[in-house]
């Protein structure tokens, strides 16, 4: 919509020192200038805003490709779950095409661990790209429970016998279960294998198979939270911030923009949740019972309205949490 399409324009104006769009933008300018634009500082700030300082955290890891004008950017990102929504927490630009490697993930996750401590991280959830024996060992050594989807052709060991994970899931399915209580060996780790068969978009059978070193009763539900990071990417790319409409070329400036996006996304999500708690009825369409508006969109519209109308009261309410109090 118009409001969401103008979000990135609004942020650009807020950073433009020549802008004369009203006192609200100048107030936002001052706030932005005072931020220490380093990845680790933003991690701490976002967690404080979300009131998640003490954990435990459920982290989501994913990678996405964005185009900034003619420049293609490969971004590895870790987000944190907040009231069922994904909020960006750490990111890095990969100077290559394709998948991340285990070193890329170590470097990014270490930035978060350095700030919050591994002991506060309950889960890290990822899809098939984010496997690997060394990666699993690293997570396990840090006491972090991984919930990772693996490829159907992967093998594990049980009583010194090599077994296909696909066959394990097939066997469980015949018993009407998603998992069993058996421990399998994957590398040096003892792991649990869970999953189910489903029909993909092409109506072909496919298996969703999850590996974890802990027995998780509702592991399918836990893994299902991974989709929130994809929803977040969608909002950032088109539904909300239109990041791909910007024309930045320098990596340092793109990193700064992603930082600003992360802060803004947190801001809008928190405001949207506040609106939902106060007026839940506005999110329900009586005709079909589905939400008529997303929490993110509600927060975005409120903040953009406060910025553009120069409404001091609304703006004060919108930025209340920026002081971290």
Task: Give the role of each language-model region.
Residues 25-85:
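Active-site-proximal, Lys/Arg-enriched surface segment
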Residues 14-27:
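Short, basic interhelical loop/turn and adjoining N-cap
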Residues 1-8, 19, 42-44, 53-57, ...:
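Single, function-defining residue in the core of a domain
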Residues 14, 31, 239:
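Short acidic/histidine-centered micro-motifs embedded in hydrophobic/aromatic stretches
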């Amino acid at each position: 919509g118009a409001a969401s399409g103008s979000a990135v324009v609004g942020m650009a104006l807020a950073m433009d020192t020549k802008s004369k769009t009203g006192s609200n933008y100048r107030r936002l300018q001052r706030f932005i200038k005072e931020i220490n634009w380093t990845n680790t500082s933003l991690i701490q700030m976002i967690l404080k805003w979300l009131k998640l300082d003490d954990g435990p955290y459920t982290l989501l890891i994913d990678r996405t490709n964005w185009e900034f004008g003619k420049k293609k950017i490969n971004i590895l990102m870790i987000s944190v779950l907040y009231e069922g929504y994904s909020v960006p927490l750490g990111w890095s630009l990969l100077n290559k095409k394709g998948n991340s490697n285990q070193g890329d993930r170590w470097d990014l996750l270490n930035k978060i661990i350095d700030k919050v401590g591994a002991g506060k991280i309950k889960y890290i959830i990822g899809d098939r790209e984010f496997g690997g024996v060394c990666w699993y060992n690293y997570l396990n050594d840090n006491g972090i429970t991984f919930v990772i989807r693996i490829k159907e052709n992967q093998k594990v060991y049980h009583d010194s016998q090599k077994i296909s994970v696909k066959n394990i899931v097939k066997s469980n399915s015949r018993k009407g279960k998603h998992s069993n209580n058996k421990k399998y060996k994957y590398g040096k780790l003892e792991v649990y294998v869970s999953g189910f068969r489903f029909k993909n978009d092409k109506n072909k059978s496919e298996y969703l198979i999850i590996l974890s070193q802990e027995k998780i009763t509702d592991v399918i539900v836990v893994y299902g939270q991974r989709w929130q990071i994809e929803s977040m990417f969608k909002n950032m790319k088109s539904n909300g911030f239109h990041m791909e409409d910007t024309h930045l070329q320098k990596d340092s400036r793109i990193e700064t923009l992603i930082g600003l996006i992360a802060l803004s996304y947190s801001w809008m999500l928190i405001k949207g949740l506040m609106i939902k708690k106060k007026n839940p009825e506005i999110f329900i369409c009586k005709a079909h019972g589905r939400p008529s508006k997303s929490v993110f969109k509600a927060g975005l519209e409120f903040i953009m309205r406060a910025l553009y109308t120069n409404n001091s009261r609304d703006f004060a309410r919108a930025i209340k949490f920026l002081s971290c109090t």
